[in-house]
Amino acid sequence: GYTEPQESEHDFFIIGHTSTSVSLASGLAKGRDLTGGNENIIAVIGDGSLSGGEAFEGLDYVAELGTNMIIIVNDNQMSIAENHGGLYKNLKELRDSNGQCDCNFFKAMGLDYMYVNDGNNVQALIEAFSKIKDIQHPIVVHINTLKGKGYARAEQDKETYHWRTPFNLETGEAKVNDEEEDYSEVTAQ
């Protein structure tokens, strides 16, 4: 989501979510290193945001920095705008080969790489992160997930359920507070 310092003491900046996480985390990692810290710095980025220029710059800098940083790529094959291009072809090759194909964009950039095929399986995630939590160099953890897993409506209509206000789980209809004006009422005024 969006970082907002008033919302969380762990958010240092106000920024949007698209393509910013890796570059932001690289700055935090550099700051940690300059002050002698050793905590894990973790960036989470979706495959839809991965194609942004700022994400590429962040990956490039992290590889050059060579320090402890975990980059989680949540690959749910979903973006509001359809994914196109070589990066997405490579992500598919990596998914299809269980992360083992010879052509690996992340390794080509100089980053270590781990693939988790069932990213909706909590135990698989715990095992993966247990293996790398003390790593002292940058690593990409490529996690293959199913958007909306476990809620049939979200699995079938990824775009509608990409982001939702509170809704009734049984009907999928938005919960509306009767005392508040809805969007249609406000725009009609």
Stretch-by-stretch model annotation:
Residues G1-L65, Y183-Q189:
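Cofactor-binding active-site loop characterized by glycine-rich and histidine/acidic residues
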Residues G27, A43-V44, I71-V73, I143:
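Structural beta-sheet core signal
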Residues E57-Y61, F105, E127-K131:
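Alpha-helical scaffold elements adjacent to nucleotide-binding pockets in ATP/GTP-utilizing enzyme cores
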Residues A63-A81:
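A glycine-rich helix N-cap at a beta->alpha junction
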Residues V73, I80, K89, N120-E181:
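Terminal amphipathic helices with adjacent charged low-complexity linkers/tails
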